[in-house]
Amino acid sequence: MANVTVTVLARVKAKEGMQDQVRRECLALIAPSRSEEGCITYDLYQSTDDPTVFVFFENWLSREHVEKHLEKPHCQEFDQRTDGMLVGSEEIVFLKKISSL
């Protein structure tokens, strides 16, 4: 079966007063993630309605690449460094494109 491009939305919510630290930790993921095999795009957004909410918008060549990404040291370290700084856990949504331009 051919690889299917996968889009991922990953959402984290910082505890009140922790958004600057969480923002820094999120930004630290950008460069190493973009250099990974299979990464097409890896961008970070911050909610304009709630500055404690950060969303990664990612495109990968396959779900296998995403799974490998989540096991990388920089992802594991992110989880450790943000421990106690987030409301709940990271929410990850896997998407497939169903419309064209």
Language model: regions and residue ranges:
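An amphipathic, aromatic/His-enriched active-site/gating alpha helix that lines ligand/cofactor pockets
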Residues: 28-40, 59-93
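Short, well-ordered beta-strand segments in beta-rich or mixed alpha/beta enzyme
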Residues: 6-13, 43-70
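Glycine-rich beta-strand-turn "strand-cap" elements at beta-sheet edges
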Residues: 1-6, 44-52, 78-101
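Residues at secondary-structure transition points
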Residues: 1, 13, 17-20, 51, ...
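N-terminal first-folded block
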Residues: 4-35, 40
